[in-house]
Amino acid sequence: YPDGNRKNFYDGKGHMDLEPDLNLCKSILSKSTLAHFNLMNWSRKLLPIAKDLGLKISCDLQDIVDINDPYREDFIKFADFIFFSTVNFSDPSSVIKNIQSKNSNPDLIIIVGMGKKGCVLATREKISFYKSIDLKKHPIIDTNGAGDELAVGFLSSFLFQKDSLENSIMRGQICARYTCSVKASTSNLITKNELETFWKELRKNPIKKE
C-alpha cells in the first residue's frame, strides 16, 4: 500500500503433511551453529534435533494474531531467539510477556518489528523500544522482506561478530530499512560494504532507545 502497509497471502499447499528426511536434515544441521525456523509445519520436527545438536535456534513467528495460538507453541518452546511483527498489536508488551512465560530459556531474546515505529528488544530483564532509522536518499518502496532482514542483520552481528545487543539491533534495523528501499528480490539484498557504510554514518547519530 502507498503508506507502507502490506497484506500477504500465503499458499502453504502440502506443508502440513510433508514428511522431511530426518536423517538427512540431521546431517545438514550437524554442520551448522544456528538454525532459523519459519512456521512451516514440517519444520517443527527439526526443532528437537537442532536442540539436541546444541544449535542456537531462531524462530520467526511472523504476524501474530492470537497470542495463544497453539500452532506456534513448539516454535516458542524451543527458541533461543524469537522474531515477530507487531502489525496486529499496537503495544507488543503483552505478547512478549506471554511468549516469555512459555519458554524456559533464561537467556531468551525477543525482537519485534514495528515498521515505521522502529523495533523492540526484549530480554528477561527489560523491554527496550528503539525508534526507526532513516537512510537518506533511500525512500521506502516495498516493505516485503524487512522482517527477514531484521533477523539476518541482528543474528549475524550478535552471534557471529559477537557484537553487543544494541549494536546488533542497529545493524538489523539498517538491513531491514535498506530492504524497504528496493523491490523485493534476493538479488537486491544489502551488501557487507553497504551495511558498514550506513553503520559508520549512523554511529554518529545513534538510534534512540525509549
Q: What is each PLM-predicted segment?
A:
Residues 108, 135-206:
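Conserved post-catalytic alpha-helical subdomain immediately downstream of the catalytic base
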Residues 1-129, 133, 163, 190-194, ...:
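Ribokinase/PfkB-type carbohydrate-kinase core domain
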